[in-house]
């Protein structure tokens, strides 16, 4: 028995020495080569809301992307990662071939368009000319309604046309201008295309065809002549007749009239195809169009291709003091006088109107900050910047500024709530404070308005291990559990268990060694393997 024990100890020592020379691989924690890049986050989720909840809990700047699966009927899984991390793998073009940006609900975004028509049903249509005329019309409308000047050089024009279908994406790169969210962008698009919608409605007196995408839009098909005239007068432009937008009316494969512009892409958490991605089952990817006139700014640290990629992202909008956020309501001519939201119910007219932000608890906290010193302030409007998880509140009736130690006489202030860093601070619209780039001292947020507290009731934890999510960085070699009886194991059973564990350890070492050799020649992990691992988890 002693001899057998000594032999076993010697065997253990030999194996320990072996593992010291060739240790088992630790859990892979990918990180980009540049030291300044943040730690890698790369997680997959079956459900979109879980992906967004995970993003909100992260201190890092991460985003949600949708990956189209080859299995199932249009099934998608959701990837959470940073722009830099995604581009690192995306640029190889060997994986992640069918990717979509998920445009977050309520988030400030760029103006964008999805254009398409059936070539066989429209043999005389000149797609390039139609795109050029549309850009010209949109630029003119932006100047008329908002006094925003732009041209074709500010429009990223992407093409994924085939022999059967003309298809384009337009993403406007407005200088220091963005829309409050994609719903407001959609309202603006519908408003400026009213003459074209009217032409379609004349062909079908009963209602606008479903292909036009007018369900629940809040717009009548009658052109908004009065509002357009008012907008022109506001910016000092002469009145004019409705523009001829007949070039936007095309026919679908059934021969029915429809709009060249897809009005269905301005919905909640819309999936919008990424630059250089293709639809599943299709071989044509979204590339820079031949007639594209937009050129991104040159940068020493970012390649031109990466710049194009970042420019194509609709929700890639960062907060700045000079950023102007545009709004467009479904029917501003029928808009009621809005109440300035405050705890006392004091009613004042709000130019933009106010509804609660995605975080009503934060709204109430901000109201508590501006209701003091016998002054009853309120929230004039808010804007949500998803990349930074930043809420920017324009305050009304409360003008106290930390920079000057008193209230401004006429200029209003802003309260900014940084949910990722759990702080709030004050800035203001006063020209002198803006010139100084003034920002007040950061103050911590109360626990009850921290993101972790706000998300506590969600079906989510930061370390998910259930069937609804998985991570590419998660260790897949989970050791089996051992069922021990209350009285322990017998000597024979101990020998069997020990041998089994030794065998398992040996197999693990051999597996790790084989994996190193097999993966050494691979540039990346195929899409099929990623999706199969997720579905089998």
Curated annotation (Swiss-Prot):
It is found in: Nucleus; Mitochondrion matrix; Chromosome. Residues 462-536 are annotated as: Interaction with RPA1. Pfam families: DNA_primase_S (PF01896), Herpes_UL52 (PF03121). A motif (Zinc knuckle motif) lies at residues 401-434. It is an enzyme of class 2 (transferase). Zn(2+) binds at residues 401, 408, 428, 433. The zinc knuckle motif binds zinc and is required for the DNA primase activity. It facilitates the binding and selection of the 5'-nucleotide of the newly synthesized primer and the recognition of preferred initiation sites. This is DNA-directed primase/polymerase protein. It comes from Mus musculus (Mouse).
């Amino acid at each position: 028995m002693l001899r057998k024990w000594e032999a076993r100890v010697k065997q253990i020592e030999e194996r320990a020495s072996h593992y010291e020379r060739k240790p088992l691989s630790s859990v892979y924690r990918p990180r980009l080569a540049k030291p300044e890049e943040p730690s890698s986050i790369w997680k997959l989720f079956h459900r979109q809301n879980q992906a967004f909840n995970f993003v909100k809990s992260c201190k890092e700047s991460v985003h949600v992307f949708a990956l189209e699966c080859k299995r199932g009927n249009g099934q998608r899984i959701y990837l959470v990662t940073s722009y830099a991390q995604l581009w690192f793998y995306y640029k190889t073009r060997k994986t992640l071939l069918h990717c979509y940006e998920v445009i977050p609900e309520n988030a400030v975004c760029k103006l964008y368009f999805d254009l398409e028509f059936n070539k066989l049903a429209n043999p005389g249509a000149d797609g390039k000319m139609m795109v050029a005329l549309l850009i010209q019309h949109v630029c003119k409308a932006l100047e008329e309604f908002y006094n925003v000047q732009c041209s074709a050089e500010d429009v990223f024009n992407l093409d994924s046309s085939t022999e059967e279908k003309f298809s384009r994406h337009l993403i406007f790169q407005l200088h220091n201008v963005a829309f409050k969210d994609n719903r407001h962008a959609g309202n603006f698009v519908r408003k400026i295309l009213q003459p074209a919608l009217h032409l379609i409605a004349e062909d079908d007196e009963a209602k606008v065809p479903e292909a036009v995408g007018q369900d629940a839009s809040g717009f009548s098909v009658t052109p908004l002549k009065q509002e357009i005239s008012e907008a022109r007068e506001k910016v000092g432009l002469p009145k004019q007749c409705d523009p001829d937008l007949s070039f936007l009316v095309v026919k679908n494969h059934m021969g029915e009239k429809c709009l060249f512009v897809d009005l269905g892409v301005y919905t909640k958490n819309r999936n919008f195809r990424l630059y250089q991605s293709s639809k599943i089952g299709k071989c044509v990817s979204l590339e820079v169009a031949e007639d594209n006139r937009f050129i991104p700014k040159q940068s020493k640290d970012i390649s031109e291709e990466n710049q194009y990629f970042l420019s194509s992202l609709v929700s890639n909008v960062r907060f700045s003091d000079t950023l102007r956020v545009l709004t467009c309501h479904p029917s501003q001519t029928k808009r009621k006088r809005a109440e300035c939201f405050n705890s006392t119910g004091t009613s004042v007219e709000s130019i933009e109107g106010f509804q609660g932000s995605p975080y009503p608890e934060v709204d109430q906290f901000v109201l508590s900050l501006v209701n003091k010193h016998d002054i009853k302030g309120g929230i004039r409007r808010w804007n949500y910047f998803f990349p930074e998880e930043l809420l920017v509140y324009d305050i009304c009736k409360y003008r106290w500024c930390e920079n000057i130690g008193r209230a401004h006489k006429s200029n209003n202030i802003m309260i900014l709530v940084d949910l990722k860093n759990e702080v709030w601070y004050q800035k203001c619209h006063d020209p002198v404070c803006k010139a100084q780039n003034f920002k007040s001292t950061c103050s911590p947020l109360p626990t009850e308005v921290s993101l972790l507290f706000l998300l506590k009731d969600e079906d989510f934890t930061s370390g998910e291990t259930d069937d609804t999510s998985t991570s590419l960085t998660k260790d897949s070699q989970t050791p089996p559990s051992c069922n021990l009886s209350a009285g322990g194991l017998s000597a024979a059973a101990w020998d069997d268990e020990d041998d089994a564990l030794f065998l398992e350890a040996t197999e693990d070492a051999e597996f790790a060694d084989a994996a190193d050799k097999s993966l050494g020649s691979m540039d990346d992990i195929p899409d099929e393997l990623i999706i199969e691992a997720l579905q089998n988890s």
